Amino acid sequence: MSKKPVMLMILDGFGISPNKEGNAVAAANKPNYDRLFNKYPHTELQASGLEVGLPEGQMGNSEVGHLNIGAGRIIYQELTRITKEIKEGTFFTNKALVKAMDEAKENNTSLHLMGLLSNGGVHSHIDHLKGLLELAKKKGLQKVYVHAFMDGRDVAPSSGKEFIVELENAMKEIGVGEIATISGRYYAMDRDNRWERVELAYNAMVLGEGEKASSAVEAIEKSYHDNKTDEFVLPTVIEEDGHPVSRIKDGDSVIFFNFRPDRAREITRAIVDPEFKGFERKQLHVNFVCMTQYDKTLECVDVAYRPENYTNTLGEYVASKGLNQLRIAETEKYAHVTFFFNGGVEQPNTNEDRALIASPKVATYDLKPEMSAYEVTDELIKRLDEDKYDMIILNFANPDMVGHTGVQEAAVKAIEAVDECLGKVADKVLEKEGTLFITADHGNAEVMIDYSTGKPMTAHTSDPVPFLWISKDAEGKSLKDGGKLADIAPTMLTVMGLEVPSEMTGTCLLNK
């Protein structure tokens, strides 16, 4: 007998904006999406700020989006949690942070603070770095060095100089800290095992090798002069009198202040993992603190903020009812439909199958805007024909990953490719008498230019996202307005005929 699958399709980075200028979502020719939008119930969901557990006005991101969708409740993000603790003062008694600083003081070694220097709030926040500098000052440390990873992706592409100036002013005011290296996140925060990139960032921080400059401002200005925006700043060692200001040495304490794990793992492993094979390097012995748990298997680090456990996430609850589920995405978003969707748990649920389709190996995705969407679709259709799954979670990475390049024509092509795939998937789900929900985790591709400067915009947005309910049963019905990402899971469970568990505080969006 054919199963009637309930499927959630997440169009990563596909937001809704009334402004047509620089809007790749509006500019794209998307007959399938438009046809479904006009025929079936739809509404808009909030995917940013307080509605997803972020500070007010903070744009959403993929990790936060998938956590909220999978949990069926608002998940207070690490950003909000850490910022709140700094304000309330508990940050300054955090065991792991205090221990790292005490050890540096007792052993008369250096403290290194490494991480993404911006207020983007996706991977890190400059205010958390300032909090660490204040704690170092309170502890009476003098040898405190910052290894700044330049952003230009979650914030404007050439805003790095302003953040360097802001950091230098803060260090002056607090009375501690010097910038030792700067590296574009393209090198320091790779997540695709491109070790030749990571090695350059590592060499700057640990060996004092790489580009040279006499100040961080000089380094970033040179990068701009060479037409390299923040993300692509070559790892640069800041020198005083011809010697590196500092480098990470045995016995030093290191605090990595990024709170998002996926782009923090590789450089962390390069520094601390005794089994590391990415490139040739000598084993360092440092006191290393990760702001959050980057990877359970990293045993040689301390963690400042351990993960909170969420019970009865959508996947866990569906598994507890003896149902089969599938998660499918290409490499770039695979962690999002598995680890993040399951509330930060690596282990698959019982009867949870996973399909990983390799992302194309290109330098930037504007060179291949269709990415692996067609391959993902082919695999999904094959799986649907097996009639095995009660619930399917699918992510199309294109609008987000191509949106991040800032190239509007490519983003338009990305959305057109996804539309083609979306049409095939919708037809197949309807043929199986199933239900398809279409949504996004946050906005991106609907704003491809910075309206204030006219330059390309590479960051996420705070725009709402669509939510479509596609099924034979949905025709002529309607969805509630004013929803948020956390309302998706209760809605899906209702359609599946399951009771919504009490832990899910989201609301079902079906109008009775």
From Swiss-Prot:
Cofactors: Mn(2+)
Catalytic-site annotation from UniProt: 62
Residues noted as binding substrate in the record, renumbered to the chain: 123, 153-154, 185, 191, 260-263, 333
SUPFAM superfamilies, alphabetized: 2,3-Bisphosphoglycerate-independent phosphoglycerate mutase, substrate-binding domain (SSF64158), Alkaline phosphatase-like (SSF53649)
EC number, UniProt record: 5.4.2.12
Domain of life: Bacteria
Gene Ontology biological-process annotations: glucose catabolic process; glycolytic process
Reaction it catalyzes: (2R)-2-phosphoglycerate = (2R)-3-phosphoglycerate
GO molecular function: manganese ion binding; phosphoglycerate mutase activity
Keyword match Isomerase: yes
GO cellular component: cytosol
InterPro entries recorded: Alkaline_phosphatase_core_sf, BPG-indep_PGM_N, Metalloenzyme, PGAM_B_sf, Pgm_bpd_ind
Summary of the function given for this chain in its UniProt record: Catalyzes the interconversion of 2-phosphoglycerate and 3-phosphoglycerate.
The protein's name in its UniProt record: 2,3-bisphosphoglycerate-independent phosphoglycerate mutase
Species this chain originates from: Clostridium perfringens (strain SM101 / Type A)
Phylogenetic placement of the source organism: Bacteria, Bacillati, Bacillota, Clostridia, Eubacteriales
